[in-house]
């Protein structure tokens, strides 16, 4: 029965992807029906904020994005610092420590949601609503806006205006879908209130304080926007965030909704629907391989415990919620790291070595399917690399969407693809070389190395999940992961927008018999091979020293 439920969940991922992709294309390309519904409200926003409707250059677009995001980071930072004297604080929570506020503000603006605090006792309701939830809408809207400009550039069109795209992302995508999802979560038992904690009497007569809050609205955008931060410290393992299997499946659907839709949006916007389908199918195969690997490992249990003859019918149950079970916990772990969300319904630090390797590889690749917008930019980056390598092998100038891929584009892509592993491995080396970093490690040996690398991989990939055995709420970890999140977020977005702007200016080369097609199975295979060779092998030495070595020692 459990496998039937898994297959149905997978089919739901597939069935909603194309319709959502079509809707996104219409939402950003000026559908008359949608303009009638949302247009008046959007024009009012533009009038109040003074936004002028004109096409921006890639530099203007990128600058607008960075300045708006930077302003939001500063505002939310001060909300966190001053929450102790601000209203909507029934628990009388004090202001955040400076480095923790720095880390948290960047974390949520970068769509990472790395949390070095526990939500129920670290933030007031005002901070949760105006700080956290606000950024949970703004962060994915930023990258969804950028990916639309990116695709327009690839299609040879004007990039558009960041402020207009940003507003449309909020009004036409995130607000309506999150509102409907929140209502469903309330129906499934997720609380939604501004009242303080409830005092309950336990069976043995003791009193217990049960915390609650505006959880349903929080969870809806947390999953839809690939944010992942928890209202409670336990995240989606907490019964108030994720009461049962129905809410669990809905959360996974929301996480996958936009990342899986973007290949179809791309195909329609560039006039090559088959290429969009090939990208979707290729990535789904990689996703499926990851799910099979982690599930097999978790169901086989811990080798050390198996050797002792301990029952393992349910597999490795350490760190897992009984109401979800091993299989759906494995699926959730695959989804949350493939879609770069970071929400967890099981503790990743307790996964088996090979089970923990899958989420780690998903984040290192940062492209299966990746988070809202940012992940798709990485997908196209790998697609261009695949075309470039194929062109070199046959001695032909590579072309992508009829545009020649030349030195300028490849230099930008080369810098972008190198920057991700440099952030992860460089900061991991720094943490391991000083007691400021190593003092936070709770496990010695191979698992301790994985804890450190996982933290920086999660930060660089804007995922936010963690091996929570790491004691990371220290100035060193707050500052270094904050820097990694900021650089990992904005560097690749800006460089790839420059690539799209460069391709926009090029004339389309007529297709000939010798043109390498990017809308067939051959390209799909080369695309997957490129992801594995260029992406996975970059981190292979670290994976050998971490989860693979741990697995071999347990064996």
UniProtKB/Swiss-Prot annotation:
Topology relative to the lipid bilayer, per the entry, is: Multi-pass membrane protein
Q: Which domain of life is it from?
A: Bacteria
**Subunit structure, interactors included:** The system is composed of three essential subunits: KdpA, KdpB and KdpC.
What gene does the UniProt entry assign to this protein? kdpA
Q: Where would you find the membrane-spanning parts of this chain?
A: 2-22, 60-80, 130-150, 173-193, 246-266, 278-298, 374-394, 412-432, 483-503, 525-545
Q: Which family does it belong to?
A: Belongs to the KdpA family.
Q: Which InterPro entries match?
A: KdpA
> Where does this protein reside within or beyond the cell?
Cell membrane
Q: Which organism is it from?
A: Bacillus thuringiensis (strain Al Hakam)
Main location (coarse class): membrane
Provide one Gene Ontology cellular component.
plasma membrane
Q: What does this protein do?
A: Part of the high-affinity ATP-driven potassium transport (or Kdp) system, which catalyzes the hydrolysis of ATP coupled with the electrogenic transport of potassium into the cytoplasm. This subunit binds the extracellular potassium ions and delivers the ions to the membrane domain of KdpB through an intramembrane tunnel.
Indicate what this protein is called per its UniProt record. Answer: Potassium-transporting ATPase potassium-binding subunit
Any one Gene Ontology MF annotation carried by this entry is: potassium ion binding
């Amino acid at each position: 029965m459990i496998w039937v439920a898994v297959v149905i969940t997978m089919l739901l991922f597939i069935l909603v992807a194309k319709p959502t992709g079509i809707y996104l294309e219409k939402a950003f390309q000026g559908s008359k029906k949608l303009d009638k519904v949302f247009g008046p409200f959007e024009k009012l926003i533009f009038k109040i904020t003074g936004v002028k409707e004109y096409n921006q250059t890639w530099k203007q677009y990128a600058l607008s994005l960075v300045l708006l995001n930077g302003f939001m980071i500063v505002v939310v930072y001060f909300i966190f610092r001053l929450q102790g004297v601000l209203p909507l604080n029934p628990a009388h929570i004090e202001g955040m420590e400076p480095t923790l506020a720095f880390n948290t503000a960047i974390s949520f603006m970068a769509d990472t949601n790395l949390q070095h605090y526990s939500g129920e006792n670290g933030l007031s309701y005002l901070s949760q609503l105006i700080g956290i939830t606000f950024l949970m809408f703004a962060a994915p809207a930023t990258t969804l806006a950028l990916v639309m400009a990116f695709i327009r550039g690839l299609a040879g069109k004007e990039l558009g205006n960041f402020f207009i795209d940003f507003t449309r992302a909020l009004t036409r995508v995130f607000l309506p879908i999150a509102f409907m999802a929140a209502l469903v979560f309330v129906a499934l038992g997720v609380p939604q209130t501004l009242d303080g904690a409830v005092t309950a009497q336990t069976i043995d007569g003791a009193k217990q304080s049960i915390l609650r809050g505006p959880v349903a609205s929080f969870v809806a955008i947390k999953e839809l926007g690939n944010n992942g931060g928890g209202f409670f410290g336990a995240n989606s393992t907490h019964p108030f965030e994720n009461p049962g299997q129905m809410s669990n499946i809905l959360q996974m659907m929301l996480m996958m909704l936009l990342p899986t839709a973007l290949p179809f949006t791309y195909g329609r916007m560039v006039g090559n629907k088959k290429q969009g389908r090939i990208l979707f199918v290729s990535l789904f195969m990689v996703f499926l391989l990851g799910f099979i690997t982690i599930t097999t490992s978790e169901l086989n249990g811990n080798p050390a415990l198996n050797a002792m003859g301990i029952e393992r019918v349910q597999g490795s149950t350490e760190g897992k919620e009984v109401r979800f079970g091993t299989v759906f916990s494995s699926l959730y772990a695959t989804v949350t790291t493939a879609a770069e969300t970071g929400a967890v319904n099981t503790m990743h630090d307790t996964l088996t070595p090979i089970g923990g390797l899958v989420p780690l590889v998903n984040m290192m690749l940062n492209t299966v399917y990746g988070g809202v917008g940012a992940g798709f930019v990485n997908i196209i980056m790998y697609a261009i690399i695949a075309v470039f390598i194929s062109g070199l092998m046959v001695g032909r100038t590579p072309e992508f969407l009829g545009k020649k891929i030349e030195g300028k584009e490849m230099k930008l892509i080369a810098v972008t693809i190198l920057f991700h592993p440099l952030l992860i491995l460089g900061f991991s080396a720094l943490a391991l070389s000083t007691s400021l970093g190593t003092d936070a490690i709770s496990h010695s040996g191979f698992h301790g190395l994985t804890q450190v690398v996982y933290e920086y991989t999660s930060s660089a990939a804007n995922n936010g999940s963690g091996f929570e055995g790491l004691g990371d709420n220290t100035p060193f970890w707050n500052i270094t992961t904050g820097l990694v999140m900021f650089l990992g977020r904005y560097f690749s977005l800006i460089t790839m927008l420059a690539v799209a702007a460069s391709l926009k200016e090029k004339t389309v080369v007529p297709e000939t018999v010798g043109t390498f097609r990017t809308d067939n199975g051959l390209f799909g295979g080369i695309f997957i091979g490129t992801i594995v060779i260029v992406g996975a092998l970059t981190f292979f030495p670290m994976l050998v020293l971490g989860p693979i070595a741990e697995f071999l020692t347990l064996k």
